């Protein structure tokens, strides 16, 4: 349109069952949409956990496993359409946030329980590792010595809890190493 417009999450497209334009056309494949089943009765408790570092885990506890037969039966009883249940079972968000645990909500300490999930970035490491600028842990770079400090990422994504961020970075680093070994 030639003018700046605010994101509306392409709600007319979403309502008609189509993905947003940005997720459909993203060359870098960094934008994904997915259905998440959740227990609405747990939202208030999750937002009110006393310790900020428990907010990330509390938000994960709100989500329901779309492969669990009891969850599927309850969803059907509550009138959730079959295609939504199937969408939840195939959701890339479920896989990244719940199964692989590499995606995180932004600033959970604000207690808004955002439903936008972020994958922490891996630093471009090959040249830095070869130049000795970052530490190595065997054949892989040490995630504690990446260019973006783990503490900084944890403060943005898990209210300061570093353990889930380190686990995610190590998983992604292992995947990077594996994929590189297949092509290099």
PLM regions with names:
Residues 23-184:
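Long, compositionally biased charged/polar accessory segments in the mid-to-C-terminal portions
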């Amino acid at each position: 349109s030639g003018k700046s417009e605010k994101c509306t999450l392409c709600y007319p497209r979403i309502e008609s069952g189509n993905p947003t334009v940005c997720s459909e056309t993203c060359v870098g494949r960094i934008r994904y949409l997915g259905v998440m089943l959740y227990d609405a009765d747990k939202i208030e408790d999750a937002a009110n956990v006393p310790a900020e570092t428990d907010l990330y885990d509390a938000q994960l506890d709100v989500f329901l496993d779309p492969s669990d037969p009891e969850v599927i039966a309850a969803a059907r009883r509550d009138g959730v359409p079959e295609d939504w249940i199937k969408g939840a079972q195939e959701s890339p968000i479920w896989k990244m946030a719940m199964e692989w645990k590499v995606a995180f909500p932004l600033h959970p300490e604000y207690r808004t329980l955002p439903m936008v999930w972020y994958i922490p970035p891996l630093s471009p490491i090959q040249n830095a590792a070869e130049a000795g600028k970052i530490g190595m842990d065997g054949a892989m770079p040490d995630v504690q010595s990446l260019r973006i400090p783990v503490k900084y990422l944890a403060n943005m994504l898990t209210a300061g809890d570093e353990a889930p961020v380190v686990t995610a970075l190590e998983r992604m680093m292992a995947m990077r190493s594996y994929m590189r070994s297949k092509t290099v």
